[in-house]
Amino acid sequence: MITMSVFATAQDIQTATAFFDQVSARYGQIEDYAADVTVSSEDRLSYGRLFYQIPNRVRIDFEQPSGQVLVSDGEVLQVYIPRYNVVLQQALRRRSEQALATLASEQGLNLLRANYSIAFLDSPDPVELDDESDEMVVKLLLNWRSTNEGYRQLILSITPDFMIRRIVGVTANYEEITFDFVGVETNRGIPDARFEYEAPASANLFNDFLFEGEG
């Protein structure tokens, strides 16, 4: 069992960026992971099972919306929306590939370090995750250095083993989106085939739904 004594490192480290680097180093030990993920905003709630593999493969099998799938093999992003029987497909540019991995790898966290200012939200002391939970976390506040970033502000809640438990992001349009990660299992040897996806043949395909493909 992980005890609260682990959190002493947060207090011993004098700067938030140094603590953030501990989180980045922890993710540097991870080849892959699976977790239950919930994404919520003021008017939307979705949840499902997340699979991640370095450097930039990701898949979410959604329970809500039921049957929806988001998958990227690092080169192509696909989103299957069964409600409309459509597949949205996007050939990824380099920056978009990085965006998928931003909060799931040592490299991605280093990108955040370069593009955001980092501070403790209130102090380096552990606090409850929220008013309804006694789970203890250290909270970091990240503010964008450039308006080119997708989120103007991020609040990262970090567990005693230096894993991200929750991300609260504020978009450029001031929309707040919360990502919760529960039951994280690391280095499971997730096969490459997990990130291969063939949508139903009857689904309508829409290419380049984010931006025009390159080449």
Locate predicted features.
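Extracytoplasmic segments of membrane-associated envelope/inner-membrane machinery
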Residues: 80, 87-123, 137-141
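Gly/Pro-enriched, hydrophobic low-complexity segments
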Residues: 114-209
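An acidic-aromatic
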Residues: 50-103, 177-178
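N-terminal leader/targeting segments and the immediate start of mature chains
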Residues: 3-46, 54, 194, 199-215
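Extracytoplasmic
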Residues: 30-34, 45-47, 55, 65, ...
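Short, surface-exposed linear segments at secondary-structure transitions and domain or protein termini
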Residues: 57-59, 96-104, 163-166, 186-192
